[in-house]
Curated annotation (Swiss-Prot):
Gene: hprK
Family: Belongs to the HPrK/P family.
Species per Swiss-Prot/TrEMBL record: Geobacter sulfurreducens (strain ATCC 51573 / DSM 12127 / PCA)
Protein name per UniProt: HPr kinase/phosphorylase
Highest taxon in the source lineage: Bacteria
Important for the catalytic mechanism of both phosphorylation and dephosphorylation as annotated region, ranges: 207-216
Record remark: domains: The Walker A ATP-binding motif also binds Pi and PPi.
Keyword ATP-binding: yes
Quaternary structure note: Homohexamer.
Tagged with keyword DNA-binding: no
Active site: H144, K165, D183 (proton acceptor), R249
Signal sequence region: none
Cofactors that this protein relies on: Mg(2+)
Amino acid sequence: MNSISLAIQDLLDDTEYGLELVLLAGGAGVGHRIHSSRIQKPGLALTGYTEHLHPDRVQVLGNTEISYLQQISEQQALIHIQKLCSYPISCFIVTKGLDPPGFLKAEAERAGIPLLVTPHQSSTFISLITKFLEERLLPTTHIHGVLVDVLGVGVLILGKSGIGKSECALDLVIRGHRLVADDVVYVKKKMPAALVGQAAEAIQHHMEIRGLGVINIKNLFGVSSIREKKIIDMVIELVDWDPVQEYDRLGLDDEVYAILDVELPHIKIPVRPGRNLTSIIEVAARNHLLKGMGYHSAREFHEKLLARMEVRPLGNEVE
């Protein structure tokens, strides 16, 4: 179960997604927590069959469910509702502005289960609340780094403080690429395995350059130089040059960097005077695009080299 949760009160307080929910009964339960973004229509649970009931999910009652409760005898309906309310239901939401039966209101109030109503049709509301819950319940983290859109590739630049991450990003922006976030990158995991990065609202569109201070990229270079959010496709880590360290010179070994259990291509770039890091990052992004099309430059070169070694002439050998 996702450790992130929302209170029912958060649904009532929504103004961004247009849920338009009103509390009818069960106000004592507005602190109930929602852990799942999945929605359930109780259906058979209203007939007494609760084998596949998921009480942790939001229970949506549409025209079909309300009509069924109104058509069967009140005594029979009350038995089924009491059984349903014996479970730790997060909340009931009635769609289409329908007026639920009085016994449902009374039982929800007695059990402390919030009973809400929305004017939306069931299909519309389920779409809205699913989007709301998915956004709010996504696993998140924050990373010290810079996120740039390079040729459509989301490049997360990492490295120790002062190594030149922001300067690289600024040079990339000057070359026509787009800044997403500088210094702190907020990352959300979207199912099944996509990571979306964005800037903290307070520092969005801004960048800190040592010796220059904080600059506003949007104002300096225009709206085409920034993005609100971007899927992270690869990680480039800037590291200090170590003369005794053996660095990958062929690119045959594909390393990965894990964020929220999602593995991303990971490249380490040694930093030393004279190296054009911006060009290297651009080429890394282009190479990533090629790999996505099934072309691996290093492997093709390696295979050609092996083939030439196998067919080369043996020379003048003495028998």
